[in-house]
């Protein structure tokens, strides 16, 4: 999915 917050995770 899209890395929210600019990191390599699917930010929540």
From Swiss-Prot:
Q: Which GO terms describe its cellular component?
A: extracellular region
GO MF annotation, one: toxin activity
Q: Predominant location of this chain? A: secreted
Which organs or tissues contain this protein?
Expressed by the venom gland.
Compartment annotation: Secreted
Q: Which UniProt keywords apply?
A: Blood coagulation cascade inhibiting toxin, Hemostasis impairing toxin, Secreted, Toxin
* Role of this protein: Anticoagulant protein. May prevent the complex of factors Xa (F10) and factor Va (F5) from binding to phospholipid surfaces and to prothrombin (F2). Also blocks the activation of factor X (F10) by factor VIIa (F7) and tissue factor (F3) as well.
Protein name listed in UniProt: Coagulation factor X inhibitor
Source organism:
Deinagkistrodon acutus
């Amino acid at each position: 999915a899209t890395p929210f917050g600019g990191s390599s995770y699917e930010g929540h």
